[in-house]
Amino acid sequence: MKRKLIAAMETCGFKEGQTLLLHGTLNPEAAYPDTFATFWTDDVPDGVHFDNVTGSYDWAFSVIIYSNDPKIVNTKKDEVRAALKAAGFIPQGKGQDAPSDEQTHTGWAMDFVITEYLI
């Protein structure tokens, strides 16, 4: 499911390892890219069960967009939400402001769930 999330984010212009990063992996010594996104797997609980066998997993992801241009944050979030929704991810609301470690950047965080069916 991470690969699916990454592929959907790449349709929005993010590049894995450059402007799309696992949350917490940005080099603290490096300058922030002008615009970038991070993601994190929040949880992957069992979904359904049948005869003591797990039939699905519900993947929960957080995606955070950061930019030094607030206009980009305010428009890119809609593009990302639409791309992830088209890829099968279910938005959990519209999101919320996200703090940044750099005063030059603002952020927007969104949560998504997608079910992985095993049977």
Where do the protein language model's features map onto the residues?
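Oligomerization/assembly interface segments of phage tail-like spikes and tubes
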Residues: 55-68, 105-116
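Small/polar-rich, solvent-exposed N-terminal microdomains that initiate assembly or binding
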Residues: 1-50, 71
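Short, low-complexity, polar/charged sequence segments that are solvent-exposed and flexible
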Residues: 40-43, 56-60, 82-86, 112-113
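Acidic-leaning, charged glycine-interspersed low-complexity segments
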Residues: 77-119
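Short C-terminal domain-edge/linker segments immediately following a structured domain
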Residues: 52-53, 67-73, 92-98
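Short secondary-structure boundary micro-motifs
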Residues: 47-48, 57-59, 81, 95-97
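Short, solvent-exposed beta-strand/turn "edge" segments of beta-rich domains on protein surfaces
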Residues: 50-55, 101-103
